[in-house]
A protein has these predicted regions:
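Catalytic machinery of carbohydrate-active enzymes
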Residues: 1-314
Length: 314
């Protein structure tokens, strides 16, 4: 059960049989009818386990309504006893120093259904026909996969997580000067940022157009390396087993960094300059300014050197 924007992720997981989408795009009587229909479908399935990964009230109500054999969530400081008593088991409250992959698996550990000490790797299933379609698209735009292919994801809905346009343009120019093909990916909302990067780069990258989340996952799967800001792209690359460089600013990479696979986290620290001793601060930019100096002052060559090292190119 998920929000509409998360549905494509579960569609790419071959272990998921049914996906129930929360009808938050509806309103009025249509929303009520959609929820009733959703509850009927869930009740009909007689699920044995309900694992609720957020502190949303819908999970507590579902647990009481469906009465599964096992229900579990995590402790939520802002919820009261009614919410907490809706579940048979409770995992510990979120920890800001542990990977989220581990903390999600804590729910299964709390029920004794998962006994391993390390969480499994992310996994998505990319079908051969999707790869074939993507390779045809690349060939149509002059990329034959005989050179190394790097995919860049530069944009975020939270601008304090972004590096300057000029930084990305310099990274692209350096990579392409070494005969590395570069594709800049992103959603429709990212197109303005991507166009600015394209305009600023001397050696032009290929931009994705109207790509779905599945298209993007497939692109990552055929790439040799993904370079991304702190975003879902980090985890999408990990899930398709492609090496990833994840560039972090205010966010704590101990929580949200890549999980398993081959990766490198780049983030400025006190070792680079005293002014970066505050990172990660967890703020929306320096003093709430929506601009993060730990990203603004990131040297392009620092990213390029790491990329060449991971691609084994010198």
């Amino acid at each position: 059960m998920c929000f509409p924007e998360s549905e494509p992720i579960f569609q790419m997981n071959k272990r998921v049989r049914h996906i129930f989408v929360i009808p938050r795009d509806k309103s009025g009587i249509k929303k009520i009818v959609a929820y009733l229909d959703l509850f009927k479908h869930l009740f009909r399935e007689h699920y044995d386990l309900l694992a609720h990964f957020s502190n949303d009230w819908r999970g507590a109500m579902l647990s009481r309504f469906l009465r599964p054999d096992i229900s579990v969530s995590r402790q939520a400081p802002r919820r009261g006893s009614f919410w907490h008593h809706s579940f048979h088991f409770l995992a510990p409250v979120l920890d800001h120093e542990r990977p989220m992959a581990e903390q999600d698996v804590d729910l299964l550990r709390a029920t004794n259904l998962y006994k391993k000490t390390v969480a499994p790797a992310y996994e998505l299933d990319i079908k051969p026909k999707e790869k074939n379609k993507l390779e045809i698209w690349l060939q149509k735009h002059g990329i034959q996969l005989k050179h190394k292919l790097v995919v860049i994801h530069a944009s975020s809905r939270w601008k304090f997580k972004e590096m300057p346009i000029s930084t990305w343009a310099k990274i692209i120019d350096e990579l392409k000067s070494k005969k590395i093909d570069v594709v800049v990916s992103g959603s429709y909302e990212d197109s303005q940022t991507n166009q600015l990067i394209y305009k600023d780069a001397q050696l032009k990258p290929l931009l994705t157009q109207n790509f779905t989340l599945q298209d993007t996952a497939t692109l990552y799967a055929v790439a040799d390396l993904v370079i991304t800001i702190d975003s879902m792209s980090t985890h999408l690359a990990s899930a398709v087993k492609t090496p990833v460089i994840s560039i972090f600013g205010p966010t704590n990479e101990k929580n949200w960094g890549p999980w398993k696979g081959k990766y490198k986290v780049i983030g400025l620290s006190k070792e680079d300059a005293e002014m970066f001793a505050c990172r990660p601060c967890g703020l929306d930019g320096c003093e709430g300014s929506k601009v993060s100096q730990c990203l603004v002052q990131m040297e392009p060559q620092k990213v390029v050197d790491q990329a060449l090292d991971m691609l084994q190119i010198r």
